[in-house]
Amino acid sequence: MSGSQLGKTDLLLNIVGYHIAHDPSPILVVQPTLEMGQAWSKDRLSNMLRDTPSLRDKVADPRSRDSGNTTMHKIFPGGHITIVGSNSPASMASRPIRIVLVDELDRCALSAGAEGDPVALARRRSATFWNRKIVQVSSPTLKNFSRIEDAYKRSTRKTFWIPCHSCGEMQTLEWSQVRWPENEPENAHYHCKECDS
């Protein structure tokens, strides 16, 4: 759970790239709508696959005749990636999936008719894998009605701690510790809570 435009989609792309290059697995990416899934595949995923040398040769371009790949389904050695919209979950059915990635959880459909909750359906696809990975990201919408807020409350709520480069104090990053000279935000830097360096 985090604010808008803070790298959540890039996190998902990095997970996809890692698994294509180093730990091939069946991957499912759930976007709020089919249209958003198509846009994500064309605008973000395809660019990453094209521009990353370690991935470029593993996933054939969907335009090549023998690739078997489409905008919404791509095959690579040892795995595949399927991109779906939460508003059309039929393509999730009957596929065992080890890596489930849900983008913008709070904007996903709550129900897809007789299929039920599409996000719950996606999560169930990973039930047979002991080493499954389920990642849900979203900017929260309505307080106390947000699915990502609820998921966060049910989680371990772990935070990322980093050491200060000067004194070694372990701390979480907080916006109040970011400072810059007046009218020079490009010179912003982080001040340690302990030693202020």
Model features per residue range: what roles?
Residues 1-197:
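Phosphate/NTP-binding elements of NTP-utilizing enzymes
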